[in-house]
Amino acid sequence: MSEVLRLENVTRRFEEGEGQLEVFSGLNMTLNAGEIVALVGPSGAGKSSLLHMAGLLEAPTSGEIHVEGVAASKLPDAERTRIRRQTIGFVYQAHHLLPEFDAAENVILPQMIAGKAKAEAAAEARRLLTTLGLGARLTHRPSQLSGGEQQRVAIARALANKPKILLADEPTGNLDPRTAGGVFDSLIAITRSQGLAALIATHNFDLAARMDRALLLHQGRLVEGAELPR
């Protein structure tokens, strides 16, 4: 499998008072095409910061982020933004859907911002939402959708511009266990069907165990192959 994302000796520190808080140090990891990897760890371990750096939303204090072979973390802002928009899709714990737009429009809009014609964007939105079980809910606004349905729209939006990499930060964290399981199944199925690489942060060890492999972020270090509590 070809490598699509690599973190090389990455360290992240934040200013705190007169000193610095080191979230993690010397992290190394790779993500290959078509691979779905769980990122687990306790609250405050730095999972969100790691995903933000992997998605070129934050720069590491030191080290490098390689996206499809390109050393990207120190590139100019405009070039990092271009790589991010062309390559990476994001799903967050909060769906961040635009309340004034319906489900289809929330998926159409980012495609049109990227330059796609409206008819083509609408067809892709319809395809993705139907695949995710929302074919009858295209014209419903977020307030008319359940929590699980809202998160499915967010997944469709993340995939609409055909990224190579999907980064998901606790995508089912706000849902009850039964709904979370259904949304997770949909996320994994559509990710695999499109051949994407995915890095998914979760506190749910049962869900993590269903992915291809798991990385444990603990005390500033990544541990691969750690035995997960069940």
Region roles according to the model:
Residues E3-L222:
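ABC family nucleotide-binding domain
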Residues P229-R230:
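ABC ATPase nucleotide-binding domains
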